[in-house]
Swiss-Prot record:
Name recorded for this polypeptide: Formate-dependent nitrite reductase complex subunit NrfG
Keyword Ribosomal protein annotated: no
SMART domains in the cross-refs: TPR
InterPro entries assigned: C-type_cytochrome_biogenesis, TPR-like_helical_dom_sf, TPR_CcmH_CycH, TPR_rpt
Domain of life: Bacteria
Higher taxonomy: Bacteria, Pseudomonadati, Pseudomonadota, Gammaproteobacteria, Enterobacterales
One GO cellular component, as annotated: plasma membrane
Source organism: Escherichia coli O157:H7
Pfam families, alphabetized: TPR_CcmH_CycH
Amino acid sequence: MKQPQIPVKMLTTLTILMVFLCIGSYLLSPKWQAVRAEYQRQRDPLHQFASQQNPEAQLQALQDKIRANPQNSEQWALLGEYYLWQNDYSNSLLAYRQALQLRGENAELYAALATVLYYQASQHMTAQTRAMIDKALALDSNEITALMLLASDAFMQANYAQAIELWQKVMDLNSPRINRTQLVESINMAKLLQRRSD
């Protein structure tokens, strides 16, 4: 008895359809999504600099350290910095104030508080922000964060001469905390804008 022959075209079509179904189901699987995400992460030129922890894990780690040693002002300051980077200004202020209470008068902490207040006020210099800067500079006339905040505000207010003077002062300190290239660029930009406004 002769079996019916399946046409070659139909076999080819079924084979191609099966291949597409297999590829399609793989592309829709969570494994493919993970492979694709990792590929994109590897292609990011800054992936080596990215934090290995997600923000929630960083927060949890900081909170655990504080619970273990609640008198550690440095950990409270790091928590304030974490919240600042998350744009959570009220919690940042609370953490920095706790660090200040534990450490006592400290120029860096006053400058950090000024920074939070400045960004909380949408980059406007308020009386409270200025008071924190003044306290920081009274304790350390070369406090970099306070000077940088004053320079940035002067630049935002189109007071380019003052911005240049402050940035130059910061650069002359030769602190490892500063990015000299960025400072030079800021000074050059202020000089350019100053010439245009004259």
